[in-house]
Amino acid sequence: MKKDVFSESERLDIIVSEIREILKRWGYQEIFLPSVVEHDGKLRKGLNITCQNEFYSVNPDPTSQMAVNFRDGLPIRKFYIREILDGIEGKFQAGIEFLCDDPVRNKVEILNILISILERLKIEDFYVDIGSLKIWKETIENIKEYRDDIFTALRRRNLSLIDDLPISSEKKEELWDLLNLRGEKCGFDKIDRLIDLVDDDRFYADLGTVRPLPYYDDIIFEIYSPRAGFPIGAGGEYKLEGTHGCGFALDLEMISEIYNIEEENDFVVVDGDLKTSYRRARGLVEDGEKVRMEI
């Protein structure tokens, strides 16, 4: 079914305005990344095209695009709002990235900002599952040849794929136990400490949570609402030339499906003849008022 672009844009405009205001309050600056860039093996997603025998990527994953353009000068606090392409499929996202020398602080800050955004949008029934790639890598160290099969099983949460592997029953049981480990605590210090520092009962340890993007280093997380059939966002930590980074992206179209728009009634309605009414409206705007011109 063809989307009503104008109606959906009105909803996204309201959502994005709220998100921008929160991120500005947290001291983040918006980054404007070029839509078309020379193809680079480090870029993820995007639409790959050729032009005059040169290869380009259109709207690639912003985290990988920032990594390609990384320069010194910490801390770096940036956010972006744009459509991300994966082939010809596109999704509108709002994302943030925080790079600094403190690998604990950046995760705690990022997750607190996530809370601020979702509460501002009155999406208070969210929950966040936090997992660890490093735990899985250590667990499968002695069966590396099945790494791709195991991570496919994790992404699909399909135990039968693990069941079919020619590995010992003890190892299968260890993998199943990790895959099903979910709760307020998990017994792994890095995750338990992070949940304690964020101090919000909507955050859970979930070792079955994995993210396919290759730049994630260890901690990853997914954001859910019971009103949405898919995650409304996701993120994780990574390293960039020795610097610790953490960020997340929100799926604006998924959020639009569950966001309840409240009618704005704080506009000053201005009418009258064109010359006088628009002069008055301009003065009101300069004084910080919001105006709506009567037609």
Each language-model region and where it sits:
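A conserved hydrophobic position in a structured secondary element of the catalytic/binding core
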Residues: 58, 131, 250
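Auxiliary tRNA-acceptor-end handling modules of aminoacyl-tRNA synthetases
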Residues: 1-9
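Positively charged, Gly/Ser-enriched RNA/tRNA-binding surfaces
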Residues: 8-29, 37-38, 61-72, 77-124, ...
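Acidic, His- and aromatic-enriched active-site or binding-groove loops in soluble protein domains
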Residues: 48-55, 143-165, 225
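Short, conserved secondary-structure transition motifs
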Residues: 130-142
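Polyanion/phosphate-binding surface patch
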Residues: 31-57, 78-80
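Acidic carboxylate-rich catalytic motifs and surrounding loops in phosphoryl-/glycosyl-chemistry enzymes
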Residues: 33-36, 129-132, 295
